[in-house]
Amino acid sequence: MSRRTARKQAFFILYQSDVTGSPAEPLIGRWRAYRGELEDYAERVVRGVERERERLDAVLDGVSEGWPVWRMSAVDRTILRLALYEMLHVQDVPPEVAVNEAVELAKGFSGEEAPSFVGGVLRGAEDKIFGKVGDGEPG
């Protein structure tokens, strides 16, 4: 399966964890029991997002002008956490790919304004973490 498919799997599990308040581990088990195969990449991302949630939320709060994480829709919040985790912890996913994939998830699963919101927040995070493109200085 593709990374895009794995991201969708991770998104579904992380979303369910967010809206129900359930830990991700039993949800991973339920996914396998009822839906079958879960990509290793999806499992890695789910566990990573759960482990890093507080840090991810702190970064998102710092760049999402006027929209603290708790005010975001659960769908947008989940997409942002997933993409930010990839940007910070998955070396073979360039930040721009994580942003583009998150925008695609937002187009498929969130509201009309979500793709621009998600893209804007993640580009702000990218600038803050990695520095502005072309300035030659790390963030």
From Swiss-Prot:
One of its GO terms (biological process) is transcription antitermination. Keywords: RNA-binding, Transcription, Transcription antitermination, Transcription regulation. This is Transcription antitermination protein NusB. Involved in transcription antitermination. Required for transcription of ribosomal RNA (rRNA) genes. Binds specifically to the boxA antiterminator sequence of the ribosomal RNA (rrn) operons. It comes from Rubrobacter xylanophilus (strain DSM 9941 / JCM 11954 / NBRC 16129 / PRD-1). The keyword Ligase does not apply. Pfam families: NusB. GO terms for cellular component: cytosol. The gene is nusB. GO terms for molecular function: RNA binding. Belongs to the NusB family. The keyword Transcription regulation applies.
